[in-house]
Amino acid sequence: MSSKNTKETNVLAQASILMVAGIVTRIIGVLYRSPVTSIIGDEGNGYYSIAVNIYTMILLISSYSIPMAVSKVVSAKMAVHQYKIAHKVFKCALIYVLVIGGIASLITFFGASVLIPSNQPKAIPVLRILAPTIFFSGFLGVFRGYFQAHRTMIPTSLSQIVEQVANAVISIGAAVLFIHAFAGGDADKIPVFGAMGSAAGIGAGVITGLLFMLFIYSCNKKYFKKEIQKDDTGVDSSYKDIFRIIFMMVTPVILSTFVYNISTVVDQTLFMDIMGFKRMASETAASLYGVFSGKYWVLINVPIALANSMSTAMIPAISGSYELKDYKKCRGHVRQAIHFTMVISIPAAIGMGALAYPIMEVLFPQKATIDLAVSILRTGCISIIFYALSTVSNGVLQGIGKVNIPLRNAAVSLVLHVVLLTPLLYFTNLNLYALVFATMFYAFLMCLLNNLSVRKYLGYHQEMKRTFMIPLLSSVIMGILCYVFYQGIYLILSGIFGSFIHLRILVFICLMISVGFAVIVYFVLVLKLKGITEAELRNFPKGNMLVRMAKKSKLL
């Protein structure tokens, strides 16, 4: 493979690394939420989600978007060999999160009673537990962004896995510990203290991830020093100028990300307020919202994480080629990113809808809400495609310096989202379905507006057949066959083993077999229909092995 082709496919290779990490961390996230939900219940999940949504918004405002900003600014400076300035940006970013993160943590802790909806006071102590995490998250983000700018996603990927493992272990352990230590057997207190313990796991995970990144940085310190020493450009910038660059870059990115994600807080606030207006008990409203955010939202975010990985991985490559005015190469990166994302996201959405019941039965088998959880997952699974595409296009626009455009698009989408959601909640009895429909509408609008903007500012025209039509056709066929296959294998195995194997274990076995069947069917179809080339397949995790298998099976 030529040097040029190697460089062009590097973004996919790096995205694959992040994608694997994203899959692993999301799977861990889903798996640990299952025992946590069994411990704290849907009501506890509701308090946890309310607090986490507020925490996330404050994190976005203070420092969450700093990795993207650091990655973009540092990679742009490195593209023109200004290594001294690149390292100065890194140091200034650390000072930035020290100040801003500290202030945000204090505001969160002391202002929790104001930030939490007035009819959900039990979520206040959960938010206070999360407050210190904001401070440490900023530092973790700076280190991740710095390594991403160096076109290596391995440190970020490993730190994400380490963080999530620590989060999972501490969340489960602390939830049990808090309940036994503080609830005193009171059923009304169990959801609150359980949610507090689960929230403590987030902080433990972030601190563990930060310690890991500090270790990796110390191991590479000599390399960074040599990099600075070989800077012979003679160009330098004052710390004042660099802080201004960071501020000018971070502010619109933060605003864009904030508006892009604030829909969860808006949804939460509208849902709680309107359900309260309809005289629904606060505990019931919290339980319902726990189903939406703690089950449905957790599950659809697994495939969306793949788009986040692609967006994160491609920003340095897009930013670097755009800085060098190599627009053709830049458009090539965009084309690869969107195609790669759709090949994964479309079957994930269809497959999740087809296997909604066994997924819920295995992970969240609470009998009181399982039918509702299955129904909203089947209804809203299509939003995975829209969120994935809007996330990638958001990253493209930020990578080419149009950071205000996603902000505008998100703001327009949010306003129309609220216009739809409010009457659906007020004048119908859709309840959670109103949230599902409104979030689907919001994701679709973001997807549409962002892609129109990419076309306008980059002159990019999307290829449709290989990117959308073939994956969609393959996924629909796969979904139908997978659903029938699951029903058949469950009928057979339950007849043979049903009398001495627990239902949940039996469903899990059938689910795993069905997922394997679905993956094989999808990739056979998409390869036969020429939706993926050999070169593209090599960029998947274990790509060379997949190519050998495809050739042996005469699919390539």
Regions found by a protein language model. Name each.
Residues 10-68, 105, 134, 251-273:
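Signature of the first transmembrane helix
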Residues 486-556:
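Membrane-proximal transmembrane or re-entrant/amphipathic helices at the cytosolic face
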